[in-house]
C-alpha cells in the first residue's frame, strides 16, 4: 500500500496541457528526507512513505528546441501537505486549480490560506529557459 501511495504521488506531480506540442521532456520523482545521527539531512528515493515524513517532489524539464513560453502545473496529492516550493514566482491554487495567486494573498473562507490548503502549483517557463527544476517540500498527512 505504501508503494502504491508513492507511485500515486509521482503520477500526480505534473499535469500540463499540450506539453507534447512544445517538445518538452519532463522527469519527476518523489524523495523522502532522512536525518542522520549527526543531524544532517539527506534525501533518498521514496520506496514507502509514512504519515509525518517530509518529502521532496522534484520536477525537471528540458526543451530540445526553442519555442513559446509555457506553463507547467502540478497537483499536490491530497495525502501531502504542501510546505513550500523552490520557485519564488510560482503560483498556487487552493481550490483545485480554478483560481491562482500567491500564498498569503488567497483566502480560504474568512482566513488567509495556509500552505496546507494548497492543491496545485504552477509556474511559467520562458523561451530562454531550455531546462530547469522545481522542488516542492511537503509532509505526508
What are these regions (language model features)?
Residues 4-13:
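Sec-dependent N-terminal signal peptides
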Residues 15-17:
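N-terminal signal peptide c-region/cleavage motif recognized by signal peptidases
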Residues 19-141:
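Exported/extracytosolic protein signature
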